Amino acid sequence: MVKPNNVKIKNKGNLKKSNESQNDYMKGKKLETKSYQKALLSKNSNNNNDGAQAKRLKKKEEFKKKLEKRQNTIVIKDKLKEPSTFLKEDQSFFDQNIFNDQDDYKHQQMNRININENFETNLFGDMMNEFDGDLNEDLDLLDYNDEVIDNSNFDNNGDQFNSEDEEFYDDEKQAKKSNKNKNADADNKKSKKSNKKEEIESSEKFESFPMDENNEQEEETTSKKKKKTGGFQSMDLTKNLLKAILKKGFNVPTPIQRKSIPMILDGHDIVGMARTGSGKTGAFVIPMIQKLGDHSTTVGVRAVILSPTRELAIQTFKVVKDFSQGTQLRTILIVGGDSMEDQFTDLARNPDIIIATPGRLMHHLLETGMSLSKVQYIVFDEADRLFEMGFNEQLTEILSKLSENRQTLLFSATLPSLLVDFVRAGLNNPKLINLDTDTKISENLSLSFFTLRHEEKLGVLLFLLKDIIYKKPQLPTTETTTTTTTNNESNQQQQKKSSTIIFVSTKYHVEFIHILLERAGIASTYIHGYLDPVARKINLAKFRSHQVGVMVVTDLAARGIDIPLLDNVINFDFPPKEKIFIHRVGRVARAGRSGIAYSLVSPDEVPYMIDLHLYLGRKFLNKFQYEGQTINDPKYSFYGTIPQTIIDRETEFVNVQRKECIELLSLTKTIHNAHKKYLSTRPGASHESNRRAKLMDKSKYHPMLSDHLNSNDQIRNDFIQSLKSFRPPQTVLELDARKNNVQVSIMKDKRKVHTNVIESQQKKLYLQQSETNLGPENEEFDYSKLDTRKRLLQLTENITEEMLRSNKSNDNNDNNKDIKMNENDDENDDDDEEGENDDDEEEENEKDEDDEEDENKNKFNIKIESSDKNDNNKKKLKSRSSSRDPNFFISATPENLIQERAMSISNRFTKDDEVNLVADTDRKQKKSMVWDKRKGKFVSSQADADRKNSKKLVRNEAGKLVEAKKSHKGYEEWKKKTHGRIQRVGEDENSKYQPNQKEYLPQKWRGQGREKEKKDNKASHAKGSHGLKGRPSELKDKNQISKNRSEKERKMRVNKTKGNPKGSKSKSGGGGGGKGSKFGSGKSKGGKSRK
């Protein structure tokens, strides 16, 4: 084992005092002065009582005892002598034998040294703090002599001892203190010997202290528990990375981090489905830093993170900076809005990680010709938003410039079909991690559906918000003015507490409903796809801070924002797909909270509601089945109508607001047209759901409205529904009822024959309703009733066939026999129906009796059926799935297959994983889908775009399509200015090509105003330097240079005008003109001679 270096302890002041330290000497002096002053005061004050003096003396004695205790426990460094000459340099006082009596006196002081307290700098304190936690195994490198070191000094590192050991050491300390207090008044030599013996005994006890088997088992169990915790410590991360994670306060990884980080470290390509706020940023940042390690001197970017927006890129940049503390990794941010020159300098410094938006990164790749061939790790953060914002061309172009050995990670909340195609093309055998719980509705979520006409939706929406969600408290009506003010205040407070989001189909509905709610006194905000990003951010901040309780939104806008936990959701337009409904409702009833999802269902949307319940496996009722049942029952969802009086009241308010508000009046027609286009692009429901929707009873009130209804309202509704369902038996031919009318007599004879057929058909429909659990009574499906129902269906089918045959044949005798048979069968049918309506015990008895009769018939009366009944066999094949008895049937698939599939990791991307949200405008819908002649179906236009055309045109960070040509203007100017360049990939890092380190700039200096701020600061520094140094700055601004140029040009013009000859105006020649100009006149000798 390696021994520590020799520790030399010197006397700092070289004092000759052996038994007293400097601190003790100073304390003694202070005590002497205090005692002298008190003695003087006591002489002067002779009137003091004896009791006061006694108290003072007691206090003095107690204080002296405390000082003696401190002196016995604390040994100051001045007490230590200089090291003796006989000690070797390679030995320390830890290795000496203190059990020798001759060395007792020499090393008595040394044995009681507290290393961390006796010196100005802690010798081992810093080192011990570094080895906290799981790194205590490194302490084995240091070999200490256990006989000398007092183990109580290492109590700070409690992780390496058990709780029983700590109790043992505490007992030893208390024993030492008690012994020292007893021997405080004794001589110094005796006290020193006793303390030395106690220390030796404690050390011997510690050496001979055996570890019990129970303690060993406890240690094993605690170590196993630590390993099974599933924290970041079990992921084999580096020391600096683990310290940075724990420093941020992250102790336990989230589910997406727990499943994705080990797979990313293994090198798999991953598609992770998780919404914002689930910890997906840490899921790809932590393994990235683990894999990259430290800065590489060879030139080349090794990791790229692409974000859809500037704000998200800045957020990930901060996370990477926090997690990369302690490493020398170089991370840069490349987003739109910052200056290109500063980003050129960042790229020239050989960064390891680039966090960028696709538009600006593509601009740099075209400008500088930079290569990404060394990239090992690329992340597409919020991939569905990247494709929604139109970055498809940039992403495919960036992928084409990467190496094939890269690791690609893609994180998204949904998987549109366009994104699935991108995954199949760009990723290598990716693993799908789908931990999004949107595939499952919470048990605390209650579903309510209101069936109504489409024109009544606006009125019902106001009724839900005013009277159900934000219900005003009932107050006494003595003072009308006070009650109105208190109701408004309470309504606003409830809106702030509970948050509600309204989903609509188009952006025009968003604007219309927002204006209508504002005029109704309900504060709201709105977000749609065409809203400005700044306005979207402001509106979302209002909703998240609970300044506003209602937000109107479309599906696409809700996909791109981080919506907090909600209390209520209203589906104004029912979603055409089940997963879109689950996506909308996913924020409600989370984290143990309860919530309600309200849906306004028009008649054409009822089949979609049935498809949803088939997907969820829930039954839906229009009344309570038993007493005490509430709407919060997780097994059922409830539907029903709203009283017409309430609907009329609210729709009247809406009509009045349309007439008064010009904006609502102008948006009314646009809403109508937008809804028509939405219906044309909406996918259709299943045929079975359309058939079942016609059989539903949509006449009863919703069970939630029991508090808002009276008994008279229910009676009125029943009467109105009976009027609606009334169908007179007379036909058009029987309107003119006369005695000798032939038509009337024919219809009477026909009715006598076909009444039984009509009744049997009605019974058949009734049985189908009860079997599909959509009848008026909404009975639960019971497998014990299945046989009787089948018999009834077969009987009614036989009846109809026989009646039709009898009508074709005109034999009266056969008709009479058939009628008798039908009457007997009808009686049997009536008996069976009564049996169904009786109690379950009677039904079971009847079933047992019928089964016994059938068994007896099968035993003795064996018949061979003919193969003529093909129709009956076909019907039996169709209804084969409904004849399963759950007591005996064993399915090939497990019951929780859907849940396990939703929470599993797979390599396949099926249609079940895809979620294509409906666009909020017709223009987006037309752009997204194009007819493909070869495939014979509609295909996404962006996925089927030509690669050649996409390379020619690239969308820049401003959102405009620009030709993908290399323009080196900005880059060349930067190279001339800084005398640097971006090195090629694979070169060794060279500092001469890198520009000087840029100065730190705060966040407010980013963007366009940065250069202006720098110039203003330079000008202010120049003005200040003139007064200090006594001379002005020699640097000139652009304005000064242009001013000097204009002044110079003006002077040149003045000089030219002064040099023009005046004699040139005369008729004389050039020479005469010259002389004339000299003398200032046009007359000269030359001129005279020429005349």
From Swiss-Prot:
Source species, please? Dictyostelium discoideum
Q: Which family does the similarity line name?
A: Belongs to the DEAD box helicase family. DDX54/DBP10 subfamily.
Output one GO BP term.
Answer: rRNA processing
Compositional bias (Polar residues): 150-161
Q: Where is the Helicase ATP-binding domain?
A: 261-433
Q: Which domain of life is it from?
A: Eukaryota
Gene Ontology CC terms: nucleolus
Keyword Ribonucleoprotein (UniProt): no
Q: Where in the cell is it found?
A: Nucleus, Nucleolus
Please report the stretch or stretches of sequence annotated as the Helicase C-terminal domain.
478-632
Indicate, by first and last residue, each region the UniProt record lists as having compositional bias (Gly residues). 1068-1079
For the region Disordered, what residue ranges are annotated? Answer: 1-63, 150-231, 801-896, 933-1091
Motif interval(s): Q motif: 230-258
Q: What is its EC number?
A: 3.6.4.13
Q: Which CDD domains match?
A: DEADc_DDX54 (cd17959), SF2_C_DEAD (cd18787)
Q: What is its main location?
A: nucleus
Compositional bias (Basic residues): 1020-1029
Q: What does this protein do?
A: ATP-binding RNA helicase which may be involved in the ribosome biogenesis.
User: Sorted alphabetically, which PROSITE patterns does this protein's record hold?
Assistant: DEAD_ATP_HELICASE, HELICASE_ATP_BIND_1, HELICASE_CTER, Q_MOTIF
What name appears for this protein in its UniProt entry? ATP-dependent RNA helicase ddx54
Q: Check the record and name the InterPro entries matching this protein.
A: DBP10_C (IPR012541), DDX54/DBP10_DEAD-box_helicase (IPR033517), DEAD/DEAH_box_helicase_dom (IPR011545), DEAD_box_RNA_helicase (IPR050079), Helicase_ATP-bd (IPR014001), Helicase_C-like (IPR001650), P-loop_NTPase (IPR027417), RNA-helicase_DEAD-box_CS (IPR000629)
Record's domain comment? The Q motif is unique to and characteristic of the DEAD box family of RNA helicases and controls ATP binding and hydrolysis.
Skewed-composition ranges (Basic and acidic residues): 26-35, 196-207, 814-823, 865-874, 944-975, 1008-1019, 1031-1052
GO molecular-function terms, A-Z? ATP binding; ATP hydrolysis activity; RNA binding; RNA helicase activity
Q: Where does ATP bind?
A: 274-281
